[in-house]
UniProtKB/Swiss-Prot annotation:
Oligomer. Interacts with host HNRNPK. Belongs to the asfivirus phosphoprotein p30 family. The keyword Phosphoprotein applies. This is Phosphoprotein p30. The keyword Phosphoprotein applies. It is found in: Host cytoplasm; Host nucleus; Virion. It comes from African swine fever virus (isolate Warthog/Namibia/Wart80/1980) (ASFV).
Length: 186
């Protein structure tokens, strides 16, 4: 059964996971009955039938023209995000909602100052965060070059979707600096 995307930080808290393999056209879903390792096993089983070239062909079909290398990187990131918390215990849904509210407020205050400060001269060599910064710039440009409050929040939500987990404070700062530098090059 097709549904809208459900892509939570803790996938095991959902009764059904819908996996969106980086594409507008290819959907894979699996029903989850219990929490914990059963969900991880179900997702692994689901992913074993999906190849990264589906991501590549879907991106090309969507007119985005990803190279095979970019598709492989994105695919690896999807796998990493899905399984990086495998050994951690699940939190109750109530504490997850509470945590998400706090993270949203932190994100808001962090990204409100996106264009107010000058970045330092050095950019850390973190390819994952750099990719997030590039995608953020693309997202901001889609809505116009002078982002208002809502556009900045949309950009951060876009980052969270790709990253799969909320950014740490130091990661937000690194991405903010990269975004500023990338926008200045335009």
């Amino acid at each position: 059964m097709k549904m809208e995307v459900i892509f939570k930080t803790d996938l095991r808290s959902s009764s059904q996971v819908v996996f969106h393999a980086g594409s507008l056209y290819n959907w894979f879903s699996v029903e989850i009955i219990n929490s914990g390792r059963i969900v991880t096993t179900a997702i692994k089983t689901l992913l074993s039938t999906v190849k990264y070239d589906i991501v590549k062909s879907a991106r090309i079909y969507a007119g985005q023209g990803y190279t095979e290398h970019q598709a492989q990187e994105e695919w690896n990131m999807i796998l990493h995000v899905l399984f990086e918390e495998e050994t951690e215990s699940s939190a109750s849904s109530e504490s997850i909602h509470e945590k998400n509210d706090n993270e949203t407020n932190e994100c808001t205050s962090s990204f409100e100052t996106l264009f107010e400060q000058e970045p330092p001269s050095e950019v850390p060599k973190d390819s994952k965060l750099y990719m997030l910064a590039q995608k953020t710039v693309q997202h901001i440009e889609q809505y116009g070059k002078a982002p208002d409050f809502n556009k900045v929040i949309r950009a951060h939500n876009f980052i969270q979707t790709i990253h799969g987990t909320p950014l740490k404070e130091e990661e937000k700062e690194v991405v903010r600096i990269m975004v500023i530098k990338l926008l200045k090059k335009k």
